[in-house]
């Protein structure tokens, strides 16, 4: 079975070798048919501490690394500045 991959935005990088990624998802409510947005935070392993808040990253599930980390960063794009 292939590993799941999620796309999200870095929210925090205050921990060593760890980033917090917010992943947004959209779905239609089954009764009211309204589009709803929900988000969830994932702790991901960032070996080189290269990602900063605002960066777009792709994370992939992995074996447990610590109590909260079950995801690793696959690739990322720097934050777009105006």
UniProtKB/Swiss-Prot annotation:
GO BP terms: translation
Domain of life: Bacteria
CDD domains: Ribosomal_uS17
Keywords, comma-separated and alphabetical: Ribonucleoprotein, Ribosomal protein, RNA-binding, rRNA-binding
SUPFAM superfamilies: Nucleic acid-binding proteins
GO (cellular component) term, any one: cytosolic small ribosomal subunit
MF-aspect GO terms: rRNA binding; structural constituent of ribosome
Function text: One of the primary rRNA binding proteins, it binds specifically to the 5'-end of 16S ribosomal RNA.
Subunit structure as annotated in this protein's UniProt entry: Part of the 30S ribosomal subunit.
Xref: HAMAP family: Ribosomal_uS17_B
Family affiliation: Belongs to the universal ribosomal protein uS17 family.
Protein name: Small ribosomal subunit protein uS17
